[in-house]
Design a protein with these regions (language model features):
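Append "and occasionally in soluble cytosolic enzymes with long acidic Gly/Pro-rich linkers
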Residues: 277-282, 358-486, 576, 630-631
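Ligand-site clamp/hinge motif
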Residues: 283-329, 485, 494-496
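N-terminal lobe/hinge region of extracytoplasmic solute-binding protein
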Residues: 105-155, 186, 257
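Aromatic- and charge-enriched surface segment that lines or borders ligand/interaction sites
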Residues: 6-7, 11-45, 149-194, 215, ...
């Protein structure tokens, strides 16, 4: 009975399968007919339109309809979440046009003209913003094309050909052409202009074969030639009628028309006629990218203390230079940028102004009595590099001819003794007077007591061994000067200090070479070419040979080094130059500093790492921004 029931069940199972297959076949025929009907209705698109979709509810069961609604909701929610996620992950802040920036600068403008600006840092600052140049520095201190779209150098390295950017225009709307470059160089070569660039271009032949091409032909190779192509170009159509002999008096020197990222807006004078503010506006037709910041204002101050007070009061947003010892009080609102700068500070001897300085033994004794590490610790908290010569470590041709920190006051005293400078002990009643150090600011004597009384003075042929040390009125510079005074008076040299305002140092002191010993910094640029600073032809203004150094052998070395692009040959010439300079002691090389720049925290885009001159802090000014806007970026 059981066996029968089992087989009966199996038979029933297969019968049910057969019935299902039969029904499926019938349904298949019906379904095919339905599909054909639907496709015929909806056409080739094979997707129902909105009118047809509303009938879906008539074919769905309640359960199927619920499932469809849930699926549709999940699909919409997922799409929305994915969209929000993509938006958040790809939404970035981009620089936007707008904003204003005001910067405090020490000094005042005089000639905002590329032909004259080399002797005034303020002029160079503004010229960098207003004028375009064939070459410029990028944020890493490398030379890149600016007004030049490209350039070529012939195999002999004597012909440089530049092709100008086709979109370059002057701020007055006129197109910039090769004729403007030709006119600018010919003006430099005209001695009536008295441009400091004359020496560099006096033997250069310049041609403009067409509107966009200009070529320079040198009499012989000049290795640093590309680096001098950073001078600004003047508009011929505005300067061609200006008498070269009176060019320095032209109104265009204070209301310049250039081709750079910013154009002249206006300047503000005080009641005495001194320019206190200089306002620049974004040039919308600038050939390069940017700029973003709408308005720039430079405000001028006589000292860093005044500039810093203006920063703390909110009168300015930044300061063009921040001394090493200074730190902003509110670091949340300020950013300090430190740039590598090829610069050294030295003591330059003007032997013509003080007979005692003509003696090499005196100059060498002063050098041996100079404690560079002590000076760096006192003035900069140790944050400076002691140097021994005019070519800095890491630069082409650097050669350490002697220790950068040699300090031997005992040997210094012996040198002076052997040179006939006799020690004179001051009388007791005159001791106080002998120990007083004289400090002058400008032409005003302030007479202050020295930190230490002179242990003795020195005389030779009834002449006292005394000198005047001139320094700029800035805290760190004054500390250095006072430290030097104490060190030198320790070996019997009487020292008077002359502290001069930064704004007048060029005009009143450097230009007429009105100093005996000058504490001053020199910026040597990317190429270490010492010619502008140590060749005898540069001893007088507008040259930069502040020691008035003259040595025919050195002149020949510097001239030969300029004529070759071979690095090994240049290094050999520079090594011989440094050896001779070390033997002659025309100056005492002290230290090299980084360049610190103070800006507001909301000023972005400053990517500069290396500069060759303080004005190069504006090298990527077109990338700076204050305002931002949100954009999607995939």
């Amino acid at each position: 009975m059981i066996r029968f029931s089992f087989w009966n069940s199996i038979a029933g199972y297969f019968q049910s399968i057969a019935k299902k297959l039969s029904r499926r076949a019938e349904h298949s025929l019906t379904e095919k007919t339905d599909q054909d009907f639907v496709f015929e209705v909806i056409g080739e698109k094979r997707f129902p339109n909105a009118t047809q979709l509303k009938y879906l509810t008539k074919f769905y069961s309640p359960t199927e309809l619920l499932i469809s609604k849930i699926a549709l909701f999940l699909a919409l929610a997922s799409s929305l979440a994915l969209g929000i996620l993509l938006y958040q992950n790809n939404l970035v802040r981009k620089p936007a046009e707008g904003g204003e920036y005001a910067e405090a600068v020490i000094g005042a403008p005089t000639y905002i003209n590329p032909l004259f600006a080399q002797t005034n840092d303020v002029d160079q600052d503004i010229a960098r913003l207003v004028f375009g140049s064939l070459m410029k520095l990028d944020e890493n201190g490398n030379l890149v094309a600016d007004l030049a779209e490209r350039y070529d150098i012939d195999p002999l390295a004597t012909t440089y050909t530049f092709t100008l950017h086709p979109g370059a225009r002057w701020h007055d709307g006129e197109p910039l052409s090769a004729q403007d470059v030709l006119f600018t160089v010919q003006s430099i070569q005209d001695q009536s202009f008295k441009s400091p660039l004359y020496v560099t271009f006096r033997n250069v032949r310049v041609q403009a074969p067409d509107e966009r091409t200009v070529s320079f032909t040198l009499a012989e190779p000049f290795a640093p030639f590309l680096s001098v192509m950073t001078f600004g170009i003047l508009p011929e159509h505005l300067w061609q009628d200006v008498d070269p002999a009176h060019a320095i008096l032209a109104e265009l020197n204070l209301k310049p028309v250039g081709s750079g990222p910013y154009r002249f807006g206006q300047f503000v004078k005080d009641k005495n006629g001194n320019i206190k503010e200089y306002r620049l506006e974004r040039f919308d037709e600038y050939y390069g990218p940017g700029p973003f910041i709408k308005d720039l204002t430079l405000k001028f101050f006589g000292s860093f203390e005044e500039a810093y007070a203006a920063f703390e009061s909110g009168n300015v947003d930044g300061i063009g230079f921040l001394p090493q010892h200074q730190t902003p009080a509110n670091t949340d609102q300020a950013a300090v940028h430190k740039f590598s700068l090829p610069q050294y500070t030295a003591l330059f001897f003007n032997q013509a102004a003080n007979p005692a300085l003509k003696e090499k033994e005196v100059r060498l004794a002063l050098s041996l009595a100079t404690d560079k590490r002590g000076i760096i610790d006192s003035a900069f908290g140790g944050d400076a590099l002691p140097v021994a010569g005019p070519i800095l470590p890491g630069m082409l041709g650097y050669a350490q001819t002697k220790s950068a920190t040699l300090f031997d006051p005992a040997q210094a005293e012996k040198l002076l003794d052997d040179a006939g400078w006799k020690r004179e002990r001051p009388e007791s009643e005159d001791a106080e007077a002998a120990g007083a150090a004289i400090v002058t600011r400008g032409s005003t004597t302030l007479g202050t007591q020295g930190e230490e009384q002179l242990p003795y003075t020195r005389t030779k042929n009834n002449a006292e061994l005394a000198l005047t040390l001139t320094a700029i009125q800035r805290d760190d510079s004054i500390i250095v000067a006072e430290t030097l005074r104490d060190l030198w008076q320790g070996i019997g040299v009487k020292v008077n200090l002359n502290i001069v305002e930064i704004a007048s140092i060029q005009k009143d002191i450097i230009k007429p070479r009105a100093y005996e010993v000058l504490l001053f910094g020199q910026i040597i640029g990317k190429d270490p070419d010492p010619y502008p600073f140590w060749h005898s032809s540069q001893a007088n203004d507008p040259g930069l040979n502040l020691a008035l150094y003259q040595n025919k052998a050195v002149d020949a070395l510097l001239e030969d080094a300029r004529k070759t692009s071979d690095a090994a040959t240049r290094e050999q010439k520079y090594a011989a130059f440094q050896t001779q300079l070390s033997q002659d002691v025309p100056a005492i090389f002290l230290y090299s500093l980084q360049y610190a720049y103070l800006t507001p925290e909301n000023l972005k885009g400053i990517a500069t790492e290396r500069i060759n001159h303080p004005s190069d802090r504006f090298a990527n000014i077109a990338s700076w921004y204050i305002k931002t806007k949100k954009r999607l970026q995939f």
